[in-house]
Amino acid sequence: MKPYVCVVGAVNLDICGRPEKKLIFRDSNPGAVTLTPGGVGRNIAHDLRLLGVEVKFLTAFGGDSHAQLLRNDCVELGMDLGCALDVPGGRTSTYLYITDERGEMQLGLSDTDISLSLIHI
């Protein structure tokens, strides 16, 4: 059997909102919204893959569209998801943050309860 590293941790969909101009609270601000794969576990697994290390990634995916997007990202990077958990009806871990016009975080919201599923393995 080929040596590998098992990474246990979260995979998140990171959603960032960045206003074009000075952030005006309690108002709608024109700007850009980006979606990127993230999560500490996923980022460690990604870095290991970039180093050529075989990775088995034990994480939890919900039953939503974010799960498929993140699962595809992990597979494209060559991670083995054979041990990953599918949580039907669960919300895939999501992190939403708003920055100011310079990119400094002003507010973050973390919806990561699905990661608690990993405790019960």
What is each model feature region?
Residues 25-28, 50-118:
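Conserved N-terminal subdomain of the carbohydrate kinase-like
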